[in-house]
UniProtKB/Swiss-Prot annotation:
The gene is Sh3bp4. Pfam families: DEATH_SH3BP4, SH3_1, SH3_2, SH3BP4_C, UPA_SH3BP4, ZU5. It comes from the Eukaryota. This is SH3 domain-binding protein 4. PROSITE patterns: SH3, ZU5. Keywords: Coated pit, Cytoplasmic vesicle, Endocytosis, Membrane, Nucleus, Phosphoprotein, Repeat, SH3 domain. Phosphorylated upon EGF stimulation. Phosphorylation prevents interaction with DNM2. GO terms for molecular function: GDP-dissociation inhibitor activity; identical protein binding; small GTPase binding. Residues 315-452 form the ZU5 domain. The keyword Kinase does not apply. It comes from Rattus norvegicus (Rat).
Length: 961
C-alpha cells in the first residue's frame, strides 16, 4: 500500500525511473554516502579467503537462495556474503563474491547490521509504526544521534520545496529549520551511473546519492554524521508515506578524503540565491532533477546545466522488394540481408525494416560470452513466403588461431522475438574470419539477432576475452562547424557499428528547452582490447588557440562497462583563446590503460568554422521576410529528384477480416465505420490506432467497408489473411478512391500560407510537375505570372499562388479546398516526406486554434508542464497590461505544441497519436465535436499502403530513415 500511495503522490510530477532505487522511511536516520572510486577487482583479489571490500563496495548478506538462469547473474545461497559495486540498476545490483562477479536481485540481499524496522528486501517499509509515538521511540533507539547532528555541518538548502529540510519537493510536510546562519554553504553533488570519470575536489562539499542506494541506511562512518531529522508531527508520518531515496536530501555526508577520480561525476544543484523568487528556483530545481536522471557526464555541467543527454541515432533502413528478390544493406555498416528470387509470390512485395541497436541486453555479456555485433532488429511485412532470407555481417572479433582457443570458443548467432530476450542460438550458415552468414527460417514479423563469442566450458579465472581478438571502436563526434566554444563526445562501442549522427539534448533552465542537437561523426578508430579493463581517454589539441578544459582532459571508462558491452559516452569541452581567429585544427585522442600505458591514439581533423554569411540568429522565425524569398536555394537532393507517375489501380496488399458484431452508431462520424455481423471488411494494415471510444480508449484498425474508409474496433474483427473472401462486397478499393477518402479531413485544417509557401519553394524542384499534379496541365508559365521569373522556387510559388486564388475565388461555382488540393498534388508527385511535414504543422496549428484558452489543460495532460513554464510561453504575447488577449491565445498554445512535438521525436505518427490521446483526456474534450484529428490519424497511417500501390517499385529507390 505504501508503494501505491507514493505512486499516487508522484503521479503529477516527474516519472519515476530505475535510478531512484528503493523506498525509505523518514522515521529512520540515514547518511547519503556515495560510491567514490569504484574499482573492479582483479582475479587475485577475489581468491582471498577473507576478502576485504575494495573501494567503497558495500557488503551485504543473502537472505534467500538464488539460482541464476543466464550468464550475467551471480549464484549464491542464503547466508553468503557479497560485495555490491553498483546499485543504479534498480532491481538488479552488480556485485561479486570470492570467485566471480555478476548481477544479483536486490530483494534477495540485505546489508550487514541491517535493522528490520527500516526497509524490507523489496524496498517497502517493514514493521512500520502505527503512530508518531512509535516513530519517536524508533528514533530514540539511535542513542546519541540527536547530539551528533548538532555538531554536523549545515544542511544543504538547495531544495526549493522545503525551508530547512531537503525532501520530496512535491510534498509540504512540516520540517525543522536548518542552521543556515551557523554554517557556511556547502555543495551537493548528484551521482549517476554510466558517466565518465572526472576529478573533483572534496573539501567541505558533500555528496548526495541519487541512485537510491539502500546502503545509505547504514550507520555513518569515518566522521560522517547524521543530520537533524524532520519533525515528528510531519503529516506524512501519520499517513505512513514512504519516499524514494533520490527525493530525499535531508542528510549530508562529509569526508576528509583527498581528491580522487571516481566512476561517478558530480552535478551541482542550483542554489537559491541565484534566483529572485521561490518559483524560479523551483523550476530550476525540477530541471536539475530531470537532468540528473538522464545525463552521462554531470561534472561538465556545473552550475549551468549544459549538454546532458546523448543518444546515438540508430541506423535504420526500410526497403520494399518484389518477387525478384535482392539485397538490403544498412547504410554505413557491413550488415545486409539477402532475399532469394521467389521469396514472395509474383505481384506481392516484402517490406524489410532493419535497425542496428547499439546497446546489447545484459544477457549477452558475461565471463563466458561477449557480444561482437550490434543487436539487429529485422521487421517483415509479409510472412506468406516460400524461401528463407540470409543475414550477413562483419563482427568485431575473431577466435585466436591456436587449437585450444578454437575448441573452446565459437561464434554463435542468437535470436529472439524480444529485444531483451530470452535469446536462443541458431546455426551459422557461413563463417570465415570476421564475416558470418545466418540463414533465417521460421520468419516472424519482428526478430532480434546478435552475434556473440561464447565458450560454455570456460572456467574461472579465464574469460572469453582470453580466446579472441576483440576490436573496440572509438568515435569522435562534434558539431557541423566549430565555434569559439563547443563540446565533443568520445564514444566507445564494443562493435564495428558507429552511427554517423549522435543526438545531444541541451538541458537549460529556460523554458521551453531547445531541440536536440545532432553531432556529426568526425572520425573513428579501431583497436584490439585484450581484456575488459579501466580505460583512460585523453584529448589534446595541436593548436595553442584551442584548449581542452584542464579538468576534462582525461576521463575514465570502467572495466565492467566494457565487459557488459555498453556504449560509453564522454563529453569534452573545447574553448578558443582568441575567438576572432577561428580555423580548423587537429584533435588527438589517446586511450590508456590503468597503468598509464597508451593502448592506441588517433588524430581527427575538425571541420571548418561556419562562413560569415551562414551565421544566423539563434531564434527560428516562422516564415521568411519578403526580401528573402528570392534568395532560397534548392537543396542538391531536390534538384536531382525525378517525380514518378501516380497510377490509378487496385490496392492489392490488403488483409481481410470477418466482422464479429453489428455496430450502429447514435452519434454519426465520418471516420468510424458502421457494419453488420458476418460481413467482411478489408484492412489497410494491422497497425493499431489508439483513441477514445464512447467510454474509454480502444484500439482500432483502418478498414474499408461498403465504399468507405474508417476505423473498426479490433475486438470486432477476426483477421483471416490476404485471401479475398467471396463474401466481400462493395466497390473495389483503388488508389484514387483511397486518396480521395483519406484526404477528407484536410479541408478542415488551419494553415499559415507564408510557411507553406516557403516549404514548397525549398523542396519542389519543378514547377511544371507541380502544375501538372494540380491539374494545370499544358499551361504556359505566363498563365501563372506576368513577369519573367528567373528562379525555379519563384515559379513554384507562382503556381501555388494561382491555386490559392482559384480556391478562394467566390465566383467559382466548383470551389475547392486549398489544403486538400495541395496535399493531393504532392502525394501524386510522391512527395510523402513533404506531405507529412505539412500535415503535422497543420494539425498543431489547428489544435492550437481549437484549444485556445484551454491550452494549459492540454499542456498538463501532454507534458505535465509547470505553471511557471506556462507563464513563460504566454509572456511574449502579453499586452501592456500583462494579459494575453483571448483571440491571441492560440499563439502560446502553438509555441508549446511545437516544442512538445520536437521532444516527441521525428515520428509524425507518434506526434499526432499522442496529441489525440492528450485531447481525449481533457474534460469535455474538443475531439467530441472536432473529429477531424481522427481523420488525420487515418491519413498518416494510410500513406504507406497508398504509396506502395500507386507507384511501381521501379519508380523510386529504397528510402532510408
Amino acid at each position: 500500500m505504501a508503494a501505491q500511495r507514493i505512486r499516487a503522490a508522484n503521479s503529477s510530477g516527474l516519472p519515476r525511473c530505475k535510478s531512484e532505487g528503493t523506498l525509505i522511511d523518514l522515521s529512520e536516520g540515514f547518511s547519503e554516502t556515495s560510491f567514490n572510486d569504484v574499482k573492479v577487482p582483479s582475479p587475485s583479489a577475489l581468491l582471498v579467503d577473507n576478502p576485504t571490500p575494495f573501494g567503497n563496495a558495500k557488503e551485504v548478506i543473502a537472505i534467500k537462495d538464488y539460482c541464476p538462469n543466464n550468464f550475467t547473474t551471480l549464484k549464491f545461497s542464503k547466508g553468503d556474503h557479497l560485495y555490491v559495486l553498483d546499485t543504479s540498476g534498480g532491481e538488479w545490483w552488480y556485485a561479486h563474491n570470492t570467485t566471480e562477479m555478476g548481477y544479483i536481485p536486490s530483494s534477495y540481499v540485505q546489508p550487514l547490521n541491517y535493522r528490520n524496522s527500516t526497509l524490507s528486501d523489496s524496498g517497502m517499509i517493514d514493521n512500520l509504526p502505527d503512530s508518531p509515538d512509535e516513530v519517536a521511540k524508533e528514533l530514540d533507539l539511535l542513542g546519541g544521534w540527536t547530539d551528533d547532528q548538532k555538531q554536523s555541518g549545515r544542511p544543504y538548502s538547495n531544495n526549493p520545496f522545503w525551508n530547512g529540510v531537503r525532501t520530496n519537493p512535491f510534498l509540504n510536510g512540516n520540517a525543522q529549520p536548518s542552521m543556515d546562519e551557523l554554517n557556511p554553504k556547502s555543495t551537493v553533488d548528484l551521482l549517476l551511473f554510466d558517466t565518465g570519470t572526472s576529478s573533483f575536489t572534496e573539501s567541505s562539499s558533500a555528496t548526495t546519492n541519487s541512485t537510491g542506494n539502500i546502503f545509505d541506511e547504514l550507520p555513518a562512518t569515518n566522521g560522517i554524521h547524521l543530520e537533524q531529522p524532520v519533525k515528528r508531527d510531519n503529516p506524512f508520518f501519520r499517513s505512513k508515506r514512504s519516499y524514494s531515496l533520490s527525493e530525499l536530501s535531508v542528510l549530508q555526508a562529509k569526508s576528509d578524503a583527498p581528491p580522487t577520480s571516481s566512476f561517478f561525476t558530480g552535478l551541482k544543484s542550483p542554489a537559491p540565491e541565484q534566483f529572485q523568487s521561490r518559483e524560479d528556483f523551483r523550476t530550476a530545481w525540477l530541471n536539475h532533477r530531470k537532468l540528473a536522471r538522464s545525463c552521462h557526464d554531470l561534472d561538465l555541467l556545473g552550475q549551468s546545466p549544459g549538454w546532458g543527454q546523448t543518444q546515438a541515432v540508430e541506423t535504420n533502413i526500410v526497403c520494399k522488394l518484389d518477387s525478384s528478390g535482392g539485397s538490403v544493406q544498412l547504410p554505413d555498416t557491413s550488415i545486409s540481408i539477402h532475399v532469394p528470387e521467389g521469396h514472395v509470390a509474383p505481384g506481392e512485395t516484402q517490406q524489410i525494416s532493419m535497425k542496428a541497436l547499439l546497446d546489447p541486453p545484459l544477457d549477452l555479456n558475461s565471463d563466458r560470452s561477449t557480444s561482437i555485433s550490434p543487436v539487429v532488429e529485422v521487421k517483415l511485412s509479409n510472412l506468406e513466403v516460400s524461401t528463407f532470407i540470409i543475414l550477413e555481417m562483419k563482427v568485431s572479433a575473431e577466435v585466436k588461431g591456436d587449437i585450444f582457443s578454437k575448441s573452446t570458443v565459437v561464434l554463435q548467432c542468437l535470436r529472439s522475438d524480444s529485444k531483451e530476450g530470452p535469446y536462443a542460438p541458431i546455426p551459422l550458415a557461413y563463417s570465415y574470419g570476421d564475416t558470418i552468414q545466418v540463414q533465417l527460417d521460421n520468419l516472424e514479423p519482428c526478430m532480434y539477432l546478435a552475434i556473440v563469442a561464447q565458450g560454455s566450458n570456460i572456467l574461472y579465472p579465464s574469460t572469453v576475452w582470453d580466446f579472441i581478438h576483440k576490436r573496440v571502436t572509438v568515435g569522435l563526434y562534434g558539431p557541423k562547424h566549430i565555434h569559439p566554444s563547443f563540446k565533443t563526445v568520445v564514444t566507445i562501442f564494443g562493435h564495428d557499428c558507429a552511427p554517423k549522427t549522435l543526438l545531444v539534448t541541451e538541458v537549460t533552465r529556460q523554458a521551453p528547452s531547445p531541440a536536440p542537437v545532432a553531432l556529426q561523426l568526425w572520425g573513428k578508430h579501431q583497436f584490439i582490447l585484450s581484456r575488459p579493463q579501466d580505460l583512460r581517454v585523453c584529448m589534446f589539441s595541436n593548436m595553442t588557440n584551442y584548449d581542452v578544459k584542464s579538468n576534462e582532459q582525461a576521463k575514465v571508462v570502467r572495466g565492467f562497462q566494457m565487459k557488459l558491452g555498453k556504449v560509453s559516452r564522454l563529453i569534452f569541452s573545447v574553448i578558443s583563446q582568441n575567438p576572432n581567429e577561428l580555423s580548423d585544427f587537429t584533435l588527438r585522442v589517446q586511450v590508456k590503460d590503468d597503468q598509464d600505458t597508451i593502448l592506441t591514439q588517433f588524430c581527427v581533423q575538425t571541420p571548418q568554422p561556419p562562413p560569415k554569411s551562414a551565421i544566423k540568429p539563434s531564434g527560428q522565425r516562422r516564415f521568411l521576410k519578403k526580401n528573402e524569398v528570392g534568395k532560397i536555394i534548392l537543396s542538391p537532393f531536390v534538384v536531382t529528384t525525378k517525380y514518378p507517375t501516380f497510377q490509378d489501380r487496385p490496392v492489392s496488399s490488403l488483409k481481410f477480416g470477418k466482422l464479429l458484431k453489428t455496430v450502429v452508431r447514435q452519434n454519426k462520424s465520418h471516420y468510424l465505420l458502421e457494419y453488420k455481423k458476418g460481413d467482411v471488411v478489408a484492412l489497410l494494415s494491422e497497425e493499431r490506432i489508439r483513441l477514445k471510444g464512447q467510454l474509454w480508449t480502444k484500439e482500432w484498425y483502418i478498414g474499408y467497408y461498403q465504399g468507405k474508409v474508417g476505423l473498426v474496433h479490433t475486438k470486432n474483427v477476426l483477421v483471416v489473411g490476404k485471401a479475398r473472401p467471396s463474401l466481400f462486397s462493395g466497390p473495389e478499393l483503388s488508389t484514387s478512391v483511397l486518396l480521395e477518402q483519406i484526404l477528407r479531413p484536410c479541408k478542415f485544417l488551419t494553415y499559415i500560407y507564408a510557411s507553406v509557401r516557403t516549404l514548397l519553394m525549398e523542396n519542389i524542384s519543378s514547377w511544371r510537375a507541380f502544375a501538372d499534379a494540380l491539374g494545370y496541365g499544358n499551361l504556359p508559365l505566363t498563365f501563372f505570372c506576368r513577369a519573367e521569373l528567373d528562379s525555379e522556387p519563384e515559379r513554384v510559388a507562382s503556381v501555388l499562388e494561382k491555386l490559392k486564388e482559384d480556391c478562394n475565388n467566390p465566383d467559382n461555382k466548383d470551389r475547392k479546398s486549398f489544403q486538400k488540393e495541395l496535399v493531393m498534388a504532392l502525394l501524386k508527385m510522391d512527395c510523402q516526406g513533404l506531405v507529412v511535414r505539412l500535415i503535422q504543422d497543420f494539425v498543431l496549428l489547428t489544435t492550437a486554434v481549437e484549444v485556445a484558452q484551454r491550452w494549459r489543460e492540454l499542456a498538463e495532460k501532454l507534458a505535465k508542464v509547470s505553471k511557471q513554464q506556462m507563464d513563460a510561453y504566454e509572456s511574449p504575447h502579453r499586452d501592456r497590461n500583462g494579459v494575453v488577449d483571448s483571440e491571441a491565445m492560440w499563439k502560446p498554445a502553438y509555441d508549446f505544441l511545437l516544442t512538445w512535438s520536437h521532444q516527441i521525436g521525428d515520428s509524425y505518427r507518434d506526434v499526432i497519436q499522442e496529441l489525440h490521446i492528450g485531447l481525449d483526456k481533457m474534460k469535455n474534450p474538443i475531439t467530441r465535436r472536432w473529429k477531424h484529428l481522427t481523420g488525420t490519424l487515418i491519413l498518416v497511417n494510410s500513406l504507406d499502403i497508398l504509396r506502395a500501390a500507386a507507384f511501381s517499385p521501379a519508380d523510386h529507390d529504397d528510402f532510408v530513415i
